[in-house]
């Protein structure tokens, strides 16, 4: 992990990690919400 090419910007690996966590959280929340919604409606 070197800082080459990241002058004044956020490291790409950090952006990828945060984005991955957010995407997983949103997808999990979406599936959980749809599962609970379908379970309660059906």
From Swiss-Prot:
User: The organism sits in which domain of life?
Assistant: Eukaryota
Topology versus the membrane: Single-pass membrane protein
Give any Pfam family that matches.
PsbJ
TM helices/strands, residue ranges: 10-30
| Keywords carried by this UniProt record | Chloroplast, Membrane, Photosynthesis, Photosystem II, Plastid, Reaction center, Thylakoid, Transmembrane, Transmembrane helix
InterPro entries tied to this protein: PSII_PsbJ, PSII_PsbJ_sf
Give the record's GO CC terms: chloroplast thylakoid membrane; photosystem II reaction center
State how it assembles.
PSII is composed of 1 copy each of membrane proteins PsbA, PsbB, PsbC, PsbD, PsbE, PsbF, PsbH, PsbI, PsbJ, PsbK, PsbL, PsbM, PsbT, PsbX, PsbY, PsbZ, Psb30/Ycf12, at least 3 peripheral proteins of the oxygen-evolving complex and a large number of cofactors. It forms dimeric complexes.
Classification via NCBIfam families: PRK02565.1
What functional role does this protein have?
One of the components of the core complex of photosystem II (PSII). PSII is a light-driven water:plastoquinone oxidoreductase that uses light energy to abstract electrons from H(2)O, generating O(2) and a proton gradient subsequently used for ATP formation. It consists of a core antenna complex that captures photons, and an electron transfer chain that converts photonic excitation into a charge separation.
This protein is called what? Photosystem II reaction center protein J
Q: Which organism is it from?
A: Staurastrum punctulatum
Taxonomically, what lineage is the organism? Eukaryota, Viridiplantae, Streptophyta, Zygnematophyceae, Zygnematophycidae
Q: Which gene encodes it?
A: psbJ
